[in-house]
């Protein structure tokens, strides 16, 4: 195998691995940065950082949902982000609980299941629940 690129100390994940869509990685990078760790978009072919948005926290997680990135922030907000290398674009946000959230949310049947260190939560995210 051939190493294509390497960035020491710049793309360090704390708890979770990034998700991949259309040749780009979307993940929380910033081992040791606690609540300030950014969500970044990285071009897989070159390692180039396309954009970075601070404030998600190193302990959060990312999952692909409907072609977008759902981020479980380290302090409770669930944030839906457009999976695009052009720019960071927040599509929706829900503060479901506080405390430390270090687990990956699960999406199934139009529902989002998440938890923190003290409680679990289920959010109905189906289009019928939004009044559409």
Residue ranges and their predicted role:
Residues 1-132:
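Noncatalytic, solvent-exposed loop/strand surfaces
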């Amino acid at each position: 195998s051939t190493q294509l690129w390497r960035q020491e100390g710049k793309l360090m994940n704390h708890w979770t691995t990034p998700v991949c869509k259309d040749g780009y990685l979307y993940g929380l990078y910033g081992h040791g940065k606690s609540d300030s760790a950014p969500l970044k978009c990285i071009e897989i072919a070159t390692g180039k950082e396309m954009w970075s948005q601070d404030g998600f926290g190193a302990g959060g997680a990312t999952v692909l949902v409907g072609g977008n990135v759902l981020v479980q922030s380290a302090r409770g907000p669930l944030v839906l982000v457009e999976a695009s290398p052009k720019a960071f674009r927040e599509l929706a946000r829900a503060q479901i609980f506080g405390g430390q959230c270090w687990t990956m949310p699960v999406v199934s049947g139009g529902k989002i299941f998440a938890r923190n260190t003290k409680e679990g939560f289920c959010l109905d995210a189906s289009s019928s629940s939004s009044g559409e």
